């Protein structure tokens, strides 16, 4: 015995969207109750009773079809409580179960006349027109009851299969057929509306048509060949998916679950409802009226007009505004159809399925973080404490700072120093991923080591901006925390910003300094024309090492473009092309001084270098010192 309420995991390889047959649509909505009654068909346009505020039976919110609106309670109230689980009430026919079944149980409307599916008729390209090899204008004339189409020419010599006839032309032919001297034995058959379209589609034998098209393609070229290939491709797709062309004409339309098109009561006693309910109501009203007209054998012109109105109602339900006048509600606002709910940026796919919010993620504005290393980013403490909360709670309990989760959460809310210390321990070595939409290539999401910062903005290293196509004029970025050890390892090994220096598209470096970085490097190393070099020996401008120069600059004893003499024993490259020094002096102890334009060297009597002072600017010392520190750090 299996419990139907248990969640079962179904593993599948892919989801395929294909045409649904009328039988499949009936299967979605039809259920057989234990007493043998078959439910699922929505026959009434009513939604809820205005006095009892309960759903109307066989209406758009029917509890018998879609399930109870209250957990474990039938419509009439005979059965209440969970102990009656699975029982179907004998009085009202409602199954006693959870109300959440109203989110997935469907119904259906059996149409009194077939209607064309507007996606396949008015889509680009029009699959109905391609399959029938007819102009779209002609197909529309048939569907919307403007022209007859010849389904069988019979013995009439002037008629051809699929030929269009106006009302007057058909009346003339009818007079001719039924004349006393008529020689036509096999009468021609014509049709109009979606019924005629369905007949034409049923007459198609896809395999034979595909074979015939392949033969025609072999002997044709140019525009005709392209048209034949287009038609063959559509037919091959129908064959591959085991779909029949006549399924593009609907005999049954599904009614989506009521909790996906809710009706809620507002404060003033009025109701707010989904637009779909209004669109379904129009379809049901027109369908019921058509069925009644057919029962009483109403004149053909009235029935035909009702069929056209039913076609327009179903068109509006599926895709409002695609053809004809847009159906509007209160305040002349167009009603949202099924297509509007699915498509676009705010549609179900892009808004709720592809772009859904996930746990362990955050979002904030980015600002420049020039003091960061390239593999680091500044993460606001407020965000970090929220993103890493489970890790912090675990560590607080493990270190016996608190005894339970509730106490840990209270401590975190107070943001004590020990919490911040634990947070720092947690984020050390735990990479986070930053993503900037739109993620157009793989470098649109990269991993960084977080550094806790004050404020509410994420700090980003300026060098990684080209990869994200980011700038600091209000751009926002999303933060994601990889949880599993495998995910953290992958993020560190493959996605760390410092490991993604080359563009995957071109192979050229994408980490290139630009804008203020280039300007800053230029300003730091530029020579000011109005600042004169100093002579060697000026004690205020002579320093024993690079650190002393930087200290003097930080103490504001020197400006960024001031000239200084600084001792430096490394290799020096300069633009001095002289072969001989400016001056040379040998002392009594054998040591020798050589004065060049930008350096002063001292050699012993064997010619070995004892010391070297170079003439440079404070900015160049800062630049050199920064590069040396960066290289040493790696």
UniProtKB/Swiss-Prot annotation:
Subunit (UniProt): In cyanobacteria the RNAP catalytic core is composed of 2 alpha, 1 beta, 1 beta', 1 gamma and 1 omega subunit. When a sigma factor is associated with the core the holoenzyme is formed, which can initiate transcription.
InterPro entries: DNA-dir_RpoC1_gamma, DNA-dir_RpoC_beta_prime, RNA_pol_asu, RNA_pol_N, RNA_pol_Rpb1_1, RNA_pol_Rpb1_3, RNA_pol_Rpb1_3_sf, RNA_pol_Rpb1_clamp_domain
Gene: rpoC1
Protein name according to UniProt: DNA-directed RNA polymerase subunit gamma
Record-stated family: Belongs to the RNA polymerase beta' chain family. RpoC1 subfamily.
A cellular component term, taken from the record's GO annotations: DNA-directed RNA polymerase complex
Function: DNA-dependent RNA polymerase catalyzes the transcription of DNA into RNA using the four ribonucleoside triphosphates as substrates.
Reactions catalysed: RNA(n) + a ribonucleoside 5'-triphosphate = RNA(n+1) + diphosphate
